[in-house]
Amino acid sequence: MDKRFQLVSQFSPAGDQPQAIEQLINGLKSGLAFQTLLGVTGSGKTFTLANAIAKLNRPTLILAPNKTLAAQLYGEMKEFFPNNAVEYFVSYYDYYQPEAYVPSSDSFIEKDAAINAHIEQMRLSATKALLERKDVVLVASVSAIYGLGDPTAYLQMMLHLTVGEIISSREILQRLVDLQYNRNETELSRGTFRVRGEVIDIFPADSEKEALRIELFDDEVEQISVFDPLTGQGIDKLARVTVYPKTHYVTPREQILKAVDAIKVELNERKKEFLEQNKLLEEQRISQRTLYDIEMMNELGYCSGIENYSRYLSGRSEGQAPPTLFDYLPKDALLIIDESHVTVPQIGAMYKGDRSRKENLVNYGFRLPSALDNRPLKFAEFEKIAPQTIYVSATPSDYEINKSQGEIIRQVIRPTGLLDPVIEVRPVTTQVDDLLSEINIRLPLKERVLVTTLTKRMAEDLTDYLHEHGIKARYLHSDVNTVERVEIIRDLRLGIFDVLIGINLLREGLDIPEVSLVAILDADKEGFLRSERSLIQTMGRAARNLNGKAILYAARITGSMQKAIKVTEDRRELQNKFNIENGIIPQGLSKQVNDVMQLGQKNLKKGNLKQGKVAEYKANYQIHSEQDILKQIALSEKQMFACAKNLEFEKAALFRDEVTKLHEQLVSIG
């Protein structure tokens, strides 16, 4: 029997949650393809969904509009389902510059990227969970609609080993190379293996902290064990194990040879076309680049940019949808689109932007026409393959309402009895000084403030201004990388700083109960940042606090402002009426501050190590065990050398200082 979801929570459904859960389950069981959950900010939509998932017991994919919200959802689901597989799938690029050609300046931009190894491991862990288990909740960004390796080839390439199996060490090593693992005798890191006599150590690409040891005797698997690659200490013994490929883009050798033949045919056709049009430079360019890729594929089984040949590698026909994360989903999967009013338009926009860039590469001989099939899904393709879907939003758009045929499940009453925030409109002429005085009122109460501006420059200038007046403030915008965004929000909740300034990221889903004031600067500047939906979403960030207030600074009241204020006031009236009728006294939310990127990792012994944050190098370690200190020294030294190798010398210096402090601590307890 499949493992069931086990929901862990100290709370029971309350407010509008019980009827919302019941309606969702009834709709899904009766075969409704689309449902919309309209839940106000702070009404516990995530808890409602977790209850529905647990009762239905179906694998679930949750799409979030950005990495920050995906990380927050991942953390919440990890808390609700600690005994099940909660996984995280977002783009693994910290920095990404796709290859492009600008005809006007005749300049070709090479592909350049910085891959986050931790997120790459989480992606591989996510697909592994989908293939192995049914009790999976997978939180993903729109990255889920981009091309991924074909699941059929991925499954074919897996290496299965069983104790007692007859297999030579040479055969195992060859299979590991086929899976794109690298041999490294000096350092066992993720995606590598080492050989010592008849003992093969493998650090699986999808594993974070545990490696495998395969012990052979006379071409027979004698023992399979799990060990800590940092200390070498054994953890467990296994009867069988499956080693998954290092990347999603692995292909069996025979498929690569078939693909190479097909690529050669297309190359000859393309060369002929260019010569007929007297495009000699383009003909020479496509020949040189493609023949180099073919040679790499013949020799190594892969090449840089192998995804551009995905049509041939996956055996799909021209124009057919590429394999994506959706191909890895089980047939009975459930799809939840969070903040659907933002996420759905994103899904529709991805294809066109990608297409226009690739057409230039194809037209000027940098890529074969088949590269156009390495793309995100078109919106129609997404609609076709999407399983049963629940749209979730406080402000659903017409698309979701039409898809649900007007059947909206409403969740307006909060379990805590909290009301929507009080709204005030104040003059724009004195907005910065007025904001400063409002911040100073909240600092003694240990309450936090969110401020939303219209531009990055304005956010940065306002941060500097507040610093000059002794206010601890930070800004959050698109230039801040994924992990750092999560850390900034965590630091705000912990009180390391008091004011967070943003543009478009301080909206959907941000769950910060400590925030009692949301200030919207230049609220009368009509546009997508100050539309009715944007204003409702932004003001909603103060709805999780007992003293929640939203201040709109404006010279006039626009149509969007008027509508947003009316919706909020109507909800507030409804919530207040419910509280009076049921004798409910509003209670502020008290939510534990977790580092979502650490959730699910096997923690070291409690009390031994105060865990530093993901992006924090000078962590304040209070370690009482010598073994833990030695382990942390080894880890910090490894990170120090990695930073130095990437020419990130400032980070390397921080890790060096950390190692020095740990050595001092080791001496003091010795």
Swiss-Prot record:
Residues 630-665 form the UVR domain. InterPro entries: Helicase/UvrB_N (IPR006935), Helicase_ATP-bd (IPR014001), Helicase_C-like (IPR001650), P-loop_NTPase (IPR027417), UVR_dom (IPR001943), UVR_dom_sf (IPR036876), UvrB (IPR004807), UvrB_inter (IPR041471). SUPFAM superfamilies: C-terminal UvrC-binding domain of UvrB (SSF46600), P-loop containing nucleoside triphosphate hydrolases (SSF52540). Residues 26-183 form the Helicase ATP-binding domain. Residues 431-597 form the Helicase C-terminal domain. GO terms for biological process: nucleotide-excision repair; SOS response. ATP binds at G39, V40, T41, G42, S43, G44, K45, T46. GO terms for cellular component: cytoplasm; excinuclease repair complex. One of its GO terms (molecular function) is excinuclease ABC activity. It holds the Pfam family UvrB. A motif (Beta-hairpin) lies at residues 92-115. Keywords: ATP-binding, Cytoplasm, DNA damage, DNA excision, DNA repair, Excision nuclease, Helicase, Hydrolase, Nucleotide-binding, SOS response. PROSITE patterns: HELICASE_ATP_BIND_1, HELICASE_CTER, UVR. The UvrABC repair system catalyzes the recognition and processing of DNA lesions. A damage recognition complex composed of 2 UvrA and 2 UvrB subunits scans DNA for abnormalities. Upon binding of the UvrA(2)B(2) complex to a putative damaged site, the DNA wraps around one UvrB monomer. DNA wrap is dependent on ATP binding by UvrB and probably causes local melting of the DNA helix, facilitating insertion of UvrB beta-hairpin between the DNA strands. Then UvrB probes one DNA strand for the presence of a lesion. Belongs to the UvrB family. The beta-hairpin motif is involved in DNA binding. Forms a heterotetramer with UvrA during the search for lesions. Interacts with UvrC in an incision complex. HAMAP family: UvrB. NCBIfam families: PRK05298.1, uvrb. This is UvrABC system protein B. It comes from Psychromonas ingrahamii (strain DSM 17664 / CCUG 51855 / 37).
